[in-house]
């Protein structure tokens, strides 16, 4: 059928094409049918939605569609039904536990990106991977397919380094120190980061407090060619676009298939042209990987996958049992990171982890002898060279290079929790800390979060401050206080844990 485009000011949460009931009956089309919309050289696939939002002779497209395709109001298009893609048969193969060939994986990924697969079919694929898994041949094929169906970055400055943390630890602003340290040593490190999904602040959320993070691939190339590094938001780029689509299914199903997680991370490193990749796997209670055995197994998979992609990969298993540094939340973390860069000093957990990771990268990149990377990283940080490099990065990304920590606004609605008894801090609940910061408004409210005054093993007296919640509104502060009282994120115990009488 031929019809005129009507742009609907809605986000359906799906890749939908709308027609009204009368047109659907005439064309014998049904809800969720896969349809193709063509106009000249433009071809768009989507799931059919039947709605009275459009009239006869109209095809409605949602804002979701317009984010990826340019269509004009009133543009004449042709809408036709499309048969079931061959890739659906390959998904069924994996549902039955069979191994997929490279060409089959490529077909699935291509159809995900082209929107030929509907939400239910993508969810079936993700479920099949969760239940039946992928072997390393399949993971490598999936990784390359995910990268090559999106944009690829080609940077002349070599070698290209990269670092990625699989996350789970509150307050992890480590890479804001690592990147300028590595770049100050003459290595190239184009760092793309995510925004928070379930955490209180992703690296991109923190960096955005003091400079821009959304750039095109050409702009990133210009920045990196000039200063040797960047700290940008990966979501503004068309890197491994299938990943963004499958993540929605993973969230809806509350699953995280191991093979898909490996491909998700490494496809973006492959697309960025990274030659040397350091993976940070935080381990401990309350993070994604809780045991050393799990961490070692995952490390082996990353290293093997890197070999198949032509990348040299090393893994750092790091302590993740409590927050990094003393702050959680975008603006608070930005203050702490900038202060550490300016002074060369800061919380031990932040400084030591940043220097440890940067040191490994310096050794991987061949600018520091084996075993001397951390020492070199410390010299770069304490000499101010890392701070000067960070100022260059901030300026090239459109921020004020002379910004000071105190210039950054934090939430002025505060409440401080104190120790209910004297004793020792025996545990800090990562998930509870994250939950409190999010209840306070982070990451959307940049000034929201919390400041920690104690760490595990420290002695406290009754009435000593434990942490302060920051919020931008009284309502958010009240929510965070209620959440904190319910979860009791900091555990304090005396030396006598329990008294048992004579029975």
From Swiss-Prot:
Its EC number is 2.4.2.57. The active site is at 256 (proton donor). It catalyses: AMP + phosphate = alpha-D-ribose 1,5-bisphosphate + adenine; CMP + phosphate = cytosine + alpha-D-ribose 1,5-bisphosphate; UMP + phosphate = alpha-D-ribose 1,5-bisphosphate + uracil. Gene3D superfamilies: 1.20.970.50, 2.40.40.20, Nucleoside phosphorylase/phosphoribosyltransferase catalytic domain, Pyrimidine nucleoside phosphorylase-like, C-terminal domain. GO terms for cellular component: cytosol. GO terms for molecular function: 1,4-alpha-oligoglucan phosphorylase activity; AMP binding; pentosyltransferase activity. Signal peptide: none annotated. GO terms for biological process: AMP catabolic process; pyrimidine deoxyribonucleoside metabolic process; pyrimidine nucleobase metabolic process. Pfam families: Glycos_trans_3N (PF02885), Glycos_transf_3 (PF00591), PYNP_C (PF07831). It is an enzyme of class 2 (transferase). SMART domains: PYNP_C. Keywords: Glycosyltransferase, Transferase. It comes from the Archaea. InterPro entries: AMP_phosphorylase (IPR017713), Glycosyl_Trfase_fam3 (IPR000312), Glycosyl_Trfase_fam3_N_dom (IPR017459), Glycosyl_Trfase_fam3_N_dom_sf (IPR036320), Nuc_phospho_transferase (IPR035902), PYNP-like_C_sf (IPR036566), PYNP_C (IPR013102), Pyrmidine_PPase_CS (IPR017872). AMP binds at residues 168, 194-199, 203, 264, 288. Catalyzes the conversion of AMP and phosphate to adenine and ribose 1,5-bisphosphate (R15P). Exhibits phosphorylase activity toward CMP and UMP in addition to AMP. Functions in an archaeal AMP degradation pathway, together with R15P isomerase and RubisCO. Belongs to the thymidine/pyrimidine-nucleoside phosphorylase family. Type 2 subfamily. This is AMP phosphorylase.
